[in-house]
From Swiss-Prot:
Gene Ontology MF term list: exodeoxyribonuclease VII activity; nucleic acid binding
NCBIfam families per record: xseA
Reactions catalysed: Exonucleolytic cleavage in either 5'- to 3'- or 3'- to 5'-direction to yield nucleoside 5'-phosphates
Name under which the protein is recorded: Exodeoxyribonuclease 7 large subunit
Source organism: Mycobacterium sp. (strain JLS)
Domain of life assignment: Bacteria
Swiss-Prot/TrEMBL keywords: Cytoplasm, Exonuclease, Hydrolase, Nuclease
Transmembrane segments: none
Length: 411
């Protein structure tokens, strides 16, 4: 069975008063107890007895108000300033009067260089395992970009070096410059915002992320996980030119091209107009020389051919061959005529022999061939022609039809 108190706050007819909600939230937060929290210090303000600051998480762009005794900051093992990465021990508090949330800390520790490097190394291994450093994912840098997106500190040496060197190499080059903060707790969100803006611009062909050298803490934003993943997700090629040659922030490994310095980035992104012009001029000169040499060589070869005796009287060889052809044709004709005569005589002799041996010659001497009709069998005995048998009698000049009247006895 529910009571009116249990139903309070569950309907517009029975709402909670502000004090009740604030009290409940304060009690819940109070039960959290002491917690260790890590973040970057921003907006550090020291008053007479209390120090106020904001503890920020750059990866998530979230912050938390923090207060502590002034002596806690003054007696810290290392000097604390905005951008310092710290670990604090504090108790969350909720102030019911104004509904604000804060953290009252009793201990503060600056994260050392060794710990920062260890965390960067752990992140490096994580990103490498995910394939963000895979060379096969690197996008090619365009040979001649129309517009270069440049992300760098305002009026910095890096900005001056990139733009000056690029303009000297290719005067027509254009820049889309974004000037975020490049160190400190607010650097990462501003750099990420500039990167997204330039990546969305269809006119930008390549993006250069440039910053001069600095300490590990100064370059820490360029090893931030959020920034590294944003670079990996860009569709526009990204060139990392952060720090000097020994520096190696994680953005160098994710970017499509790593430049040793901002000056080196300008040289690798923008071709040298003078060098390209010299290269083209040299190609034209070498091509012309090669063409002249080829023409000279072929002309010399042609002169050699023209100087040959056969080309002085080019028809002489043809005439000689023509005479040979005529003689061969005449000889062939003689041979054919002789062969035809010989074969004709041979055919005549064979024909005469066939005539002498054939039945026509026998018939011409008075003989006849008698055949029974209608089967045309040659009559060989009288028994083959009984009375009434129709006969065909073939003689030298034709054939006679007769009918057998019977047989006579041989005498």
């Amino acid at each position: 069975m529910t009571t009116p108190a249990d139903d309070q706050g569950k309907s517009p007819e029975n709402p909670w008063p502000v004090r009740a909600v604030a009290t409940r939230v304060a009690k819940y937060i109070d039960r959290l107890g002491m917690v260790w929290i890590e973040g970057q210090l921003t907006e550090l303000k020291i008053r007479q007895t209390t120090a106020w600051m904001v503890l920020r998480d750059p990866a998530a762009d979230m912050s938390l108000s923090v207060s502590c005794p002034r002596d806690l900051v003054a007696n810290a093992p290392v000097p604390l300033s905005e951008g310092t990465q710290v670990i604090v021990l504090g108790k969350p508090q909720f102030y019911t009067r104004n509904g604000s949330f804060s953290l009252r800390i009793s201990e503060i520790r600056a994260v050392g260089i060794g710990e920062l490097l260890a965390r960067i190394d752990r992140l490096r291994r994580l990103l490498d395992a995910e394939g963000l450093f895979d060379p096969r994912l690197k996008r090619p840098i365009p040979f001649l970009p129309g517009t270069i997106g440049l992300i760098t500190g305002r009026a910095s040496h890096a900005e001056r070096d990139v733009m000056t060197v690029a303009a000297n190499r290719w005067p027509a080059v254009r820049f889309a410059v974004r000037n975020p903060i490049v160190q400190g707790p607010n650097a990462v969100p501003q750099i990420v915002g500039a990167l997204r803006e330039l990546d969305r611009d269809p006119g930008v062909d390549v993006i250069v992320l440039a910053r001069g050298g600095g300490s590990v803490e100064d370059l820490l934003p360029f090893s931030d996980e959020t920034l590294c993943r944003e670079i990996a997700s860009c569709t526009t090629p990204v060139v990392s030119a952060v720090g000097h040659e020994p520096d190696n922030p994680l953005c160098d490994l994710v970017a499509d091209l790593r430049a040793a310095t901002p000056t080196d980035a300008a040289k690798r992104v923008v071709p040298d107009a003078a060098a390209e012009q010299a290269f083209v001029t040299d190609l034209r000169r070498r091509s012309a020389r090669a063409l002249r040499q080829w023409v000279h060589r072929e002309q010399h070869h042609l002169d050699q051919l023209r100087s040959r005796p056969v080309l002085a009287r080019p028809l002489q060889a043809i005439d000689a061959r023509a005479d040979e052809v005529h003689r061969a044709v005449a000889a062939a004709r003689r041979d054919v005529r002789r062969m035809v005569t010989v074969e004709s005589e041979r055919v005549g002799h064979l024909s005469a022999r066939l005539t002498a041996l054939g039945p026509a010659a026998t018939l011409a001497r008075g003989y006849a061939v008698v055949q029974t009709m209608p089967d045309t069998n040659v009559l060989r005995t009288t028994a083959d022609a009984p009375a009434g048998t129709r006969l065909r009698i073939r003689v030298a000049d034709g054939a006679i039809t007769a009918v057998s009247e019977g047989t006579d006895e041989a005498h």
